[in-house]
């Protein structure tokens, strides 16, 4: 039976994942009643609190560009870049990126060289020029705008000015790349311009530079003239035409030009078909994470529920076949392959970034908080582990179960042939550049505007947001929290005058007993998991909202992956703590075959690292069958002095468990941890106390465990 996803059913893909106790716990009773009256300064006449699935779309936001008719109204509206300023550990990730590989990639990557670069040439000619520059710039520039870093902003503007100045008379711009050599008529490759359009949109949000709109208008007018048989025909552009579609709608919402909707239909018609029931046009991990949203994007124009359903079906299909693992992603290293669905199968760093990007867009389009839940899962449990703690090196592939990170060729255990598990700043060409956008896109979409001129807190972290609400008043909301390493979020309102607007607070699906206080007064409301608390009132400066999100231990069983289990505490999933031995290697001698660097790049300043296990990793967990959660103890530790809880060994939350070694579970002939043994498994080894740490802080990890019989 096919579910109409407009009802946004909350079922997890497939019955293969069984919650023993935890994230998928029973929902609270349904109610739409306003909250009970609160005493003191929270007056009943001034307060309406209720749990809602999503904001209504009976009106459209008055203050920010949003979907124009005939596009369906968005449930959430993106705020301009730099509206959200992170603090605490979240800001620390951006600072580490700025001071690490992201901020210095211009000194290393040949594709960011200013010599013979096609992005700097009016005719689009040059030795260097494809996806790498915009991949990097869309993250680098947004980090600069958000941190208000003058050097990063200046460097970003150098490239943006070149793009604006070098648009050709035809309206086309960027590297003049043609694909289909040997064909009678090779086609102009449009893929590389798609991420650059995202860079231009961020720059326009930051600067309001009208030249961006003019460039895009001329470029899309040129796209309309490209013959259909030459339009979006190469593999990458054909798979990822949905990115082009997003940019067309972005411009339409600012100009109202109806010809853009004609172009949107042309793009949809010529993009790979992501609406095929039970299969995908290809199984490349980044294409999937980036392109599965294309049907739901076009649904905004088509109003055809089959388009929306197709996106949900694609997401569910991939998780059903290859995503029966913790961390929110799926195994596809580079492509997903039948028979390779064990948690040792990896995902590209690019794939994580594109999943976070897709989730943010789908959250706006559908109002369905499951997309925010998945962003949390990916960002907190997978993404940080793709880097060394200082963000000066990264690896192409990261897996939920990964006990070695080195320069060996692990093919065919993984699909890629080469040193794809090595932490190397000179390697991983696409991920080396695209990684920059991961955390900053998470930050930018942590707060959103709503159609009823309010604000929504989507992804909790220490931050502040400046936005226009209600009658047009500019307010500042400050969130004070160490979430996900604590259970409470404290929000303070600053406003020049009293202003009425709704504030939406997302209740994560794992949280079964959220509680709300306003100005110290408890508000009686059923906060349903997966919904939003909508707080409508007349807000005054220094009003204070406290949201408690009590975290519980949870154990998930992956029936399709040998009955293995994963252990959660709130939004965090935990890995065995494996001692990590770092071995420094030459960055230039351990690269993938397509790596290129500038002649003056100093490899001695940017070493590569192998990470080898310095302790046993092959354990089975002992579980209390009647109460699995009782098998674990939560241990709180001090906050790290450098403010980075994802650095190796610094997480302020750990778990304790018991287990036994499984001697037969070893490194296999491909140099990977062998596939999981079927649980329950027997072992005569002594019982040991095991230390578990958040998997996002574990570069070597076992996050899907066998269980003992």
Model-derived regions: residue spans:
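N-terminal secretory signal peptides and thylakoid transit peptides that target proteins
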Residues: 1-16
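Signal peptide processing junction and immediate N-terminal pro/mature segment
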Residues: 23-35
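C-terminal beta-rich recognition modules with glycine/proline-rich loops and embedded aromatic residues
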Residues: 34-59, 311, 373-381, 386-492, ...
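Asp-box/WD-like beta-propeller blade repeats and closely related beta-sheet repeat scaffolds
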Residues: 179, 183-184, 213, 219-234
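Hydrophobic, small-residue-rich alpha-helical packing segments that form membrane-like cores
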Residues: 220-223, 227, 234-277, 281-288
